[in-house]
Amino acid sequence: MPFKSLTLAEIRSYEQETVEFETGENLIFGPNGAGKSTILQGLFGGLFQTNITKKEVNNDFNLPELVRKQAESGRIELAFVVGGEEFTVEWEIKKQFDDDGEVTGAQTKSGYPKLSSPALDESISGFNDVQDEIQRIIGMDAKSFVNSVYVQQGD
């Protein structure tokens, strides 16, 4: 399952960045703090809406921390190919504020995450429906994906 591209808008250290992936192997490297882990979070979070940087795969994203401090909302868009068909999953996150302007939390915007493809009769939206469809398309769940393709730092 090759990744085609990843767009991060107002996510962690990225104001607006699109990473285009080449066919075959791609190397992500850079100094500490350059955003390598954010790219991995974008890839994995885009597919499964879960956090890959923890030892256990779970839904423990700290959504307010994903969105840049200066921004009110952020967006992840991931394009990937399965069986010759391209799929795009979009995930938008909006911070929530109290009356004093302090961040109190965050949630996915209405209608997100969203999965679209010419291979689908119509776009699919909503956390559970998108997650179920992606698992069906790629033939594995988040835990199986991590165990197949990802090595944690320090492992």
Regions found by a protein language model. Name each.
Residues M1-D132, R136-N147:
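Extreme N-terminal "head/tail" segments of very large remodeling/mechanoenzyme assemblies
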Residues N147-D155:
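Short, intrinsically disordered, charge-balanced linker/junction segments flanking boundaries
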